[in-house]
Design a protein with these regions (language model features):
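Solvent-exposed beta-hairpin/edge-strand motifs
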Residues: 47-59, 585-604, 702-715
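Surface-exposed beta-strand/loop patches in extracellular or lumenal glycoproteins
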Residues: 38-47, 566-592, 690-706
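An acidic-aromatic substrate-binding cleft motif
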Residues: 175-231, 235-240
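Beta-strand-rich recognition/accessory modules
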Residues: 19, 44-45, 83-194, 459
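Active-site-proximal substrate-binding groove within the catalytic cores of carbohydrate-active enzymes
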Residues: 156-157, 371-651
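Aromatic- and carboxylate-enriched substrate-binding clefts and catalytic-loop regions
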Residues: 226-460, 464, 492
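Non-catalytic C-terminal accessory domains or segments of carbohydrate-active enzymes
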Residues: 532, 557, 561, 618-748
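Polysaccharide-binding surfaces and accessory modules of carbohydrate-active proteins
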Residues: 1-130, 594
Length: 748
């Protein structure tokens, strides 16, 4: 296709390539004039009038995936993309939404999804925008980008970003396939195993010092090293004058980074540091000595784009990465850190050079503000510099303009900062972790994701710690621990230990595009009537149910995590309304014609068999919620509990003999066990536990047909305790070698 724009003196040539599973559109822009032209905003695909785009039956109920790097969600096409706390009533107004990199719409009535994405992002940040009006329908849809005031010479032809269009019945599968296309196109080779790191930020912030780091490393070596802890990362606070642009140590690190890296190396750890390499503080001599290295706007150069939040405050500028001398400065400074033994780099505030206001630059034939070319150039310089010194170094890309570091850095920050426990609101946590749910498809495709730092210690509640830990584990990405290990209470240690080592693969948010019914039940009405008493449904967005499959050599099962994000609603100021999830078995990928055993990890409660007629009572009262499983019919699994909380169900197929249904050691409820077997002749269930030395816990078994049961742990008699719903519990303490255990059934 050829599009000629006579008034602009330009031409766009588009080639459509029909692949087996998608359409690819490659585009070229040509300046037809005898003068240089400025390329600003550009649309590659666009509808120009009402009715030109339609997303199927009852399209107002269609669900739209939108991505903003650190944020992400799936919403109704007819619902505002703003958080519920900010949204205003949208009755007759037009709703506008946008998404970077890719956009998707799914119609649950037609069971059809359409994905539009950018296959390349070398110079520009591709965006998809859509408008909807309840009365008029889709008011507009386009794919394009801010071209960043790129100078195009007379007669010059410029390659634009490639886009793809995909359709399919499974919206999540389309996202995964899109991620695979990105991975192959850009030669991304994700790490096989996600790293485990410790970060100084939340326990210490600017007060961090050498001794803090070494004290935490010593405890980490004792309790976490065998579970994968490898990187000890010093966040903002080590730099001279606390400047984000300083590469020299302050007095809190009197021996310097090189000495610290050597001390950590003796413990088997790598030193990591935080750095904001594209940020220059007004207090840094560079700002005064080399203003030409900094980006400007249409009024001034350099132009500050933000006021630094922490000491010493002040204005900050973005490095002009189109300037050769600024590039050399970046090479020199990053190399200096690698030469000091730094092997892990948390690179933050990487979005400055992309700021749409900062278009005034040294080389106008490289896109800076408004695009990603200059930032990608800077990321390439960093990657090449660091790997020329240490090919094994790791880099975490912290940039809401996600494409800037794709293909250069292995680790991908995938949500907003989590904050210390207790301080952030449940609403923020819900929106932030739903963003993680939206981004799980990126793991092992665009890189290894990191859902920000993991804090499990006080002052927040134990339930909050469990929510954070569950998200960190089921994300399947890097786990970055950010608690003071020298003061962490033992109850929080149990939370932390239970999610290590990392899963290595992500869960699937099965309700993201098709939210399940979430009900509220009335305490007073159930007490009075003896029947179920619904107080209405909660219209929830998806991202509350994450499912992960666990495969071992002795069994396979699924982990189902249910997130109730909100505090209980009240009615008439007298009662809390409890939350009930109504989950179709089909959503979990399970066959309701089969029988399953269900175990909840955080409460260590065996919930019994499901589906089960015994869970259905003619008389219902509020105390029934203590069973957690409210009902389990052939169609639906009903789980009831008060939020904010998380429940993690391990669901296995029922056996015709005794079998393990859960443990207290690891969130997988059995992934830490090996060689589990049942000997029918000897009536013996046995296996091995593999955990760090000294961890106290238990395993849970069911299917016991005799009253007399004996157990041994490490060939010594062990206690047998009766648990919930006919289960038995065998306490044990892990040892250096695999801990062997046996459960023997004696004849009556």
């Amino acid at each position: 296709m050829i599009w000629v724009f006579k008034n602009a003196g330009a031409k766009i040539v588009q080639e459509i390539i029909n692949h087996q599973n998608f359409l690819e559109i490659n585009s070229l822009f040509q300046n037809l004039t005898n003068e240089s032209t400025c390329l600003n905003e550009l649309s590659l695909l666009e509808t120009t009038g009402l009715g030109e785009a339609s997303f199927g039956t009852r399209q107002e109920e269609a669900r739209v995936y939108e991505d903003g790097g650190y944020w992400g969600h799936v919403r109704k096409l007819s619902r505002s993309p703003k958080p519920s706390s900010e949204a205003v009533e949208q009755v007759s107004r037009e709703i506008q939404g946008s998404s970077q990199l890719c956009w998707e719409v799914y119609n649950p009535f037609d069971r059809m999804a359409f994905l539009a994405g950018f296959l390349t992002f070398e110079r520009w940040l591709g965006m998809v925008e859509a408008g909807f009006n309840a009365s008029l329908g889709v008011t507009g849809w386009k794919m394009g980008f801010d071209a960043g005031d790129l100078t195009v010479d007379p007669g010059e032809t410029v390659k634009l970003e490639d886009v793809i269009l995909m359709i399919g019945e499974d919206p999540w599968l389309l996202l995964e396939e899109f991620g695979d296309l990105i991975r192959r196109k850009h030669g991304i080779m994700p790490l096989k195993n996600p790293p485990v790191s410790w970060c100084s930020w939340y326990p210490f912030r600017l007060s961090v010092n050498e001794e803090h780091v070494l004290e935490n490393a010593r405890i980490g070596a004792e309790r976490l090293k065998s579970l994968g802890l490898k990187n000890i990362q010093v966040d903002l606070g080590w730099e001279k004058d606390y400047l984000p642009s300083s590469y020299d140590e302050n007095k809190q690190f009197p021996h310097g980074l090189k000495w610290l890296s050597e001390q950590l190396g003796k413990m088997g750890f790598n030193l990591g540091v935080w750095k904001a390499p594209f940020v220059i503080s007004e207090h840094d001599p560079v700002a005064a000595q080399h203003p030409e290295w900094l980006l400007g706007d249409e009024k001034e150069k350099p132009a500050p784009y933000w006021t630094w939040f922490w000491k010493p405050y002040g204005k900050v500028y973005a490095l002009d990465l189109t300037h050769p001398e600024a590039q050399n400065y970046l090479r020199e400074k990053m190399a200096s850190l690698a030469k000091k033994g730094v092997k892990y780099f948390k690179l933050d505030f990487m979005n400055g050079p992309c700021n749409p206001r900062l278009r005034n630059r040294y080389n106008r034939r490289i896109v800076a503000g408004g695009g990603v070319e200059a930032a990608r150039l800077g990321c390439r310089i960093i990657a090449e510099t660091l790997r020329s010194i240490d090919p094994e170094c790791l880099v975490l890309n912290c940039n809401p303009y996600e494409p800037c570091g794709l293909g250069y850095f292995q680790l991908l920050y995938t949500c907003n900062d989590t904050g210390n426990t207790g301080y952030v609101t449940w609403q923020f946590m819900k929106e932030n972790y739903r963003a993680v749910a939206s981004h799980l498809w990126k793991n092992h495709r665009l890189g290894i994701i990191e859902p920000s730092c993991l804090c499990v210690g006080p002052p927040g509640t134990l339930e909050e710690a469990r929510i954070r830990a569950t998200v960190a584990f089921l994300s399947g990405g890097e786990i970055s621990i950010s608690d003071n290990l020298t003061t962490l209470p033992e109850e929080r240690w149990q939370v932390l230990l239970s999610i290590l080592p990392p899963a290595g693969f992500s869960a699937k948010p099965v309700d993201l595009f098709e939210p399940v019914t979430v009900e509220q039940l009335s305490y007073e009405e159930m007490s009075r009537s003896g029947r179920e008493a619904s107080a209405g449904n909660i219209e929830e967005e998806g991202g509350n149910i994450w499912v992960q499959r666990v495969d071992t050599e002795w069994d396979s099962w699924i982990i189902v995590s249910l997130f109730a994000w909100d505090p209980p609603k009240t009615r008439e100021g007298r009662e809390h309304l409890i939350t009930r999830f109504n989950i179709p078995w089909s959503l979990l990928g399970l066959n309701p014609d089969r029988k399953y055993w269900v175990y909840e990890f955080w409460s260590s409660q065996f919930l019994g068999e499901a589906p089960s007629k015994s869970l259905r009572n003619s008389y219902t009262h509020p105390g029934d919620a203590g069973k957690l499983l409210w009902s389990a019919t052939e169609e639906t699994l009903q789980v009831t509990f008060f939020g904010p909380a998380v429940r993690v169900l391990a669901i296995r197929e029922k056996r015709q003999h005794p079998w393990i249904v859960g443990t207290s050691f690891h969130l997988t409820s059995g992934g830490e066990l090996r060689n589990v077997t049942w000997d029918e002749t000897g009536k013996v269930l046995k296996g091995e536990l593999q955990r760090p030395v000294g961890q106290l816990g238990f395993i849970v078994a069911t299917g016991i047909s005799t009253k007399r049961v004996e157990a041994t742990v490490d060939n010594r008699p062990a206690s047998v305790q009766h648990g919930a719903n006919g289960s038995i519990i065998i306490p044990m303490v892990s040892t250096e070698h695999p801990l062997r255990w046996e459960i023997r059934l004696e004849e009556q």
